[in-house]
Amino acid sequence: MIKQFFSNVYEGIKHYSNYLWELSKKQLIKIYLNKKHLIWKISIILICAFIVLLTSFLTRNSILNATQSYWELIPGFLVINITGNTGVSFGTLGDSNPSLVYFVQSIPIVLGFFVLLFSSNYLLDIGVSLVFFGGLSNIIDRSIVDNYKYLSGISTNNAVVDYFQFPFIKNSAIFNFPDTFVIIGMIFVGIQIIISFVKDYKKEKDSEENKKPIKDVVLDEERNKTKKEPIKKPIVIQKS
């Protein structure tokens, strides 16, 4: 009985895997045989990569050459507070093993890669590209060990260079440009999910309104069959 159970489970997984593979092939063919869509997709990915990587590492280089670790950028709203973040975004997992941090930080990158591979929506491509390259920037940043030119006591060993902070929020997390791009990307993805949900809802609603119940159709047919023609009044000819 146990052997039969595992055999059925194996066959089910095999069948479902084949189904997913066939579905994936159809989606890939649909995306990558459309030359116009492919050009737009590649352009979006390259533009997002250029913006995220250039902004992130130019800013990082400027921070490494800073002469002070704290100053107001926008008084009362945004300050520069330089720190080395050994965790993931916004200081999460700060005291964890570096291997665990690298693993957790790589998850959205791997997921983002597969979403980009199968996505056929431009807004989703923008959002996922920002998340992908934002996460990639942080991993690259963490793997580079640099020394601050003028500052001391801040380590870059297995740490991401963080610098932005909101002073009006108590115990506000310190973040950087890659984190910002990840958040913006997630907002784009959320917007696309809402748009898709609304479109599907309207489509389903319109379909229900246009689809007449079978019972009503049968009743209409029966009425048409039993409907009698109007009785013509006999013409009476009066004799003179």
Curated annotation (Swiss-Prot):
Keyword Transmembrane helix: yes
Entry keywords, A to Z: Aspartyl protease, Cell membrane, Hydrolase, Membrane, Protease, Transmembrane, Transmembrane helix
Pfam families: Peptidase_A8 (PF01252)
Lipid metabolism keyword on record: no
Stored InterPro entries: Peptidase_A8
Stretches that traverse the bilayer: 38-58, 73-93, 98-118, 120-140, 177-197
Pathway(s) of this molecule: Protein modification; lipoprotein biosynthesis (signal peptide cleavage)
Reactions that this protein is recorded to catalyse: Release of signal peptides from bacterial membrane prolipoproteins. Hydrolyzes -Xaa-Yaa-Zaa-|-(S,diacylglyceryl)Cys-, in which Xaa is hydrophobic (preferably Leu), and Yaa (Ala or Ser) and Zaa (Gly or Ala) have small, neutral side chains
Top-rank lineage group of the source organism: Bacteria
Entry's Gene Ontology BP terms: proteolysis
Record's subcellular location: Cell membrane
Membrane topology recorded in Swiss-Prot or TrEMBL: Multi-pass membrane protein
Active site: 162, 179
GO molecular function, one term: aspartic-type endopeptidase activity
Broad class of the protein's primary localization: membrane
EC number(s) on file: 3.4.23.36
GO CC annotation terms, alphabetical: plasma membrane
Family statement drawn from the similarity comment of this UniProt entry: Belongs to the peptidase A8 family.
PANTHER family per the UniProt record, alphabetical: LIPOPROTEIN SIGNAL PEPTIDASE
Biological role stated in the UniProt entry: This protein specifically catalyzes the removal of signal peptides from prolipoproteins.
Protein name (database record): Lipoprotein signal peptidase
